[in-house]
From Swiss-Prot:
Residues 463-493 are annotated as: Type E(+) motif. Residues 494-588 are annotated as: Type DYW motif. Transmembrane segments: none annotated. Belongs to the PPR family. PCMP-H subfamily. Keywords: Repeat. This is Putative pentatricopeptide repeat-containing protein At5g52630. One of its GO terms (biological process) is cytidine to uridine editing. PPR repeats lie at residues 14-48, 49-79, 80-114, 115-149, 150-180, 181-215, 216-250, 251-281, 282-316, 317-351, 352-386. GO terms for molecular function: RNA binding; zinc ion binding. Residues 387-462 are annotated as: Type E motif. The keyword Repeat applies.
Length: 588
């Protein structure tokens, strides 16, 4: 960028005024106005003044134009510590962590000392990269420079360790800080929520309220996420009420978490109400609502919302398209799914392995297994476990054991794989009556020292989660639960229910198969709900694995015989059973 050096000597009030205008343009995202100001700065030679250069870097950073920030930085002949801090922060804020850390190295090579503005940007970059090793180096640097006791630097370190999964280090840092602010508390809560340590996160939130800490939207979002992950609907509603009293319910950040809470707890109408009440919607809340509709089989609403999102001017990202593809897959809309897959290229978004896995799943569910295989064969990137796994699952559904074995071999060629792949192959063999091959697949799993994930179902009652495993009798109400199932079983048989014992994936005699399938975990959880909840309350059951075909059929009969709404969330989607019908239309 050419500079007019003869115009450098200008009255001081001129460059102060320019700085104020650049700051205003950054705050209001007035890109055109900012570009015009930059042109004036160049013509008048004001870019030689460090304060002006700093404001130019900040303007481009806030406008999400980090490479223009870099040009402004490079055009500045006098780079102060603040100039370096501005560019390092710019890269961190614009998701360019490696560049942020690279410029930190350059700054230190110039014998400039990083301060309490630079160090938080560096730790943020480490958190984005999940590079705890580099983060520890930044931590050491903060100790050498004496900034480790600074509340902002300390908070950023807590956040970094938490996001890198080093929850013990995060808590140690949190406990040793001489002073904490709301960012510190929120970072620690987020860390516990991310690691699934929900009780710790909730306890910390209560402690923050007890200390009269002015919690922020990040705090609310973290604790609402805990309630969502634990499916604690009633507690989540209470915290939602608290967020309204604190005026944080209109935040897109909190709104996204609330949408996820109501969706994961089986209340999609609550999710949509929250979505509608957030005045300014960011991409996160659009994606959260799309996912909620997709999980609840509201495919048409997904497509309508996607169109509405684009009309609003919001640009979709890879998560947006993944939600739309999953919705099409679950509804069997293959042609529509292919259309949206192709639209990704028009939006200049390269499909990831997750998008290809969704496309393979879509074709596989529809029985178009050869087309699914062709998609994998022609992928421009290497197929991952999730891609081959999608084909393997479809082969199990359509009892194509030869192709299932081929897909499994391809997965095993990738190296160590999840236990789910072995189980899927075993299930494919068992579904086809090849119990000897199924046993071999499970033996291979045992020989590798891996364990099959235990199927669990759980239900919330008065902020307490009751968990059940198939056939267990450890619950305090086991006697009543099994009596209820026996009574309900008789009513279901009178209504025409016949157990499909082909879903018992091991070779046992007919009577034992009949008994085994009647006591799957979701049935125990439903029976608990029937004897515990009032008649007008829907029974909401969560399950960590896919619901089996016979249980899916049985729950339809249960909804008829009990005249109850039963909502089951498995590891894939929601099923709402009412009057003998399921929201998935038996396509899952």
């Amino acid at each position: 960028m050419a500079l007019n050096s003869s115009a450098f000597f200008v009255p001081c009030h001129n460059y102060n005024q320019i700085c104020d205008l650049l700051l205003s343009s950054a705050r209001t995202r007035s890109t055109i106005k900012g570009l015009q100001l930059h042109g004036y700065v160049v013509k008048s030679g004001l870019s030689l003044i460090p304060l002006v250069a700093n404001n130019l870097i900040n303007f481009y950073s806030k406008s999400q134009l980090p490479f223009d920030s870099r040009r402004a930085f490079e055009d500045s002949p006098q780079k102060s510590s603040t100039t370096w801090s501005s560019i390092i922060s710019c890269f961190a804020q614009n998701e360019l962590p490696w560049m942020s850390l690279e410029f930190l190295k350059k700054m230190m090579a110039g014998n400039l000392r990083p301060d309490d503005h630079v160090l938080p940007s560096a730790t943020k970059s480490c958190a984005i990269l999940s590079r705890c090793d580099i983060g520890r180096s930044v931590h050491c640097l903060s100790m050498k420079t004496g900034y480790d006791a600074d509340v902002f630097v300390g908070s950023s370190l807590v956040d970094m360790y938490a996001k890198c999964g080093e929850i013990v280090y995060a808590r140690k840092m949190f406990d040793e800080m001489p002073q904490r602010n709301v960012v510190t508390w929120s970072g620690m809560m987020y860390g516990y929520a991310q690691m699934g340590e929900n009780e710790e996160a909730l306890w910390l939130f209560k402690e923050a309220l007890f200390e009269n800490l002015a919690v922020n939207d990040y705090s609310f979002s973290s604790v609402i996420s805990v309630c969502a992950n634990s499916t604690l609907l009633e507690l989540g509603r209470q915290i939602h009420g608290l967020s309204i009293k604190s005026s944080f319910d209109s935040s897109s950040f909190v709104g996204s978490s609330l949408v996820s809470l109501y969706s994961k707890c089986g209340v999609p109408e609550g999710a949509y109400q929250v979505f509608n009440e957030v005045p300014v919607k960011n991409l996160g809340i659009w994606n959260a609502m799309l996912k909620a509709y997709a999980q609840h089989s509201h495919t048409q609403k997904v497509i309508e919302l996607f169109k509405r999102m684009k009309l609003s001017g919001m640009k979709p990202n890879f998560i947006t398209f993944l939600n739309v593809l999953n919705a099409c897959s679950h509804a069997g809309l293959v042609d529509e799914g292919r259309y949206y897959f192709d639209q990704m290229k028009e939006s200049r978004i390269e499909p990831t392995d997750k998008h290809y896995a969704s496309l393979v799943d879509m074709l596989g569910r529809a029985g178009r297994l050869q087309e699914a295989l062709e998609v994998i064969t022609n992928m421009p990137i290497d197929p991952t476990e999730s891609v081959w796994g999608a084909l393997l699952t479809s082969c199990t559904v359509h009892k194509n054991t030869e192709l299932a074995a081929f897909a499994a071999d391809k997965v095993f060629e990738l190296g160590p794989v999840s236990s789910g792949m072995h189980i899927s192959l075993s299930n494919a063999y068992a579904a086809d009556g090849r119990f000897e091959d199924a046993a071999k697949a499970r033996k291979l799993l045992r020989d590798r020292g891996e364990k099959k994930e235990t199927g669990l179902s759980w239900v919330e009652e008065r902020n307490k989660v009751h968990t059940f495993a198939a056939g267990e009798r450890r619950h305090e109400k086991s006697k009543e639960i099994y009596e209820k199932l026996a009574e309900l079983g008789e009513e279901m048989e009178k209504a025409g229910y016949i157990a499909d014992t082909s879903y018992v994936l091991r070779e046992v005699d007919g009577d034992e198969k009949n008994q085994t399938i009647r006591y799957h975990s979701e049935r125990l959880a439903i029976a608990f709900g029937l004897i515990t909840f009032p008649a007008d309350r829907p029974i909401r059951v969560m399950k960590n694995l896919r619901v089996c075909g016979d249980c899916h059929n049985a729950i339809k009969f249960m909804s008829v015989c009990t005249r109850r709404v039963i909502i089951v969330r498995d590891n894939n989607r929601f099923h709402r059973f009412e009057d003998g019908k399921c929201s998935c239309n038996d396509y899952w």
